[in-house]
Amino acid sequence: EAAAAPLPNHAAPRGKAGLEGFDGLAEALGGTVLGQPDYLQKLVIALKRPYVMGREGESARNAFLVTGPADTGKHLSLCAAAEELARRGVFVSGDISWMDLSLYPTAAEEKLFLQDLYMALAAKGDIVVFEHYERCQPAFLTVLSNLVQRGKSPLAGRYVLQNGRLVDAGNALVTDAVGALTPRGKYLVLL
């Protein structure tokens, strides 16, 4: 069986701070995201959960859905939370990987989707946000569902890593074929 894509060196260790890094976080975010105290408290709970409950291996640290009307601070709150948690030493980086799933409406975009997903999961930040899931090819949503529910999503073909990118191996015999993707300990957020 082919292995899951290996972790880049920067993705293995996460920030050093633990639960104490979340103290007063909702209040701090309230200075940036105005008028949303209940939402910010729920966001902090979602981000804090894996530090309370724990997690195994490369499974997602947590997966959650952020909903609400346009222009209510969803993007801003995620960015502010990531930056503040990085500043506090909980996250290694304040970066967020964003994937617009409306770019993959048909099965013809499979290779592009897998490449973009791999790059998002391999990025330095701790959060991957998936936007416009309702406009995505349903088969690709199954990949995301597997990442959330099983902690791994098998790939239909075999891939190899070349210069940090997943490349279809076709029928080539390769020693380090990638047969699955893992969440790599990231937060997976549907927006």
Where do the protein language model's features map onto the residues?
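Short loop/turn elements that form and flank the Walker-type P-loop nucleotide-binding site
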Residues: 58-61, 72, 91-92, 122-124, ...
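Pre-Walker A (pre-P-loop) alpha-helix and adjacent loop at the N terminus of AAA/AAA+ ATPase modules
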Residues: 19-62
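Short glycine-rich substrate-engagement loop in P-loop NTPases that contacts/grips substrate
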Residues: 93-126
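Walker A/P-loop
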Residues: 55-98, 145
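Conserved AAA+/SF3 P-loop NTPase catalytic/coupling segment centered on the Walker-B
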Residues: 77-78, 110, 122-165, 187-190
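Extended, charged/polar low-complexity intrinsically disordered regions
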Residues: 1-20
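AAA+/SF3 P-loop NTPase mechanochemical coupling elements
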Residues: 60, 156-191
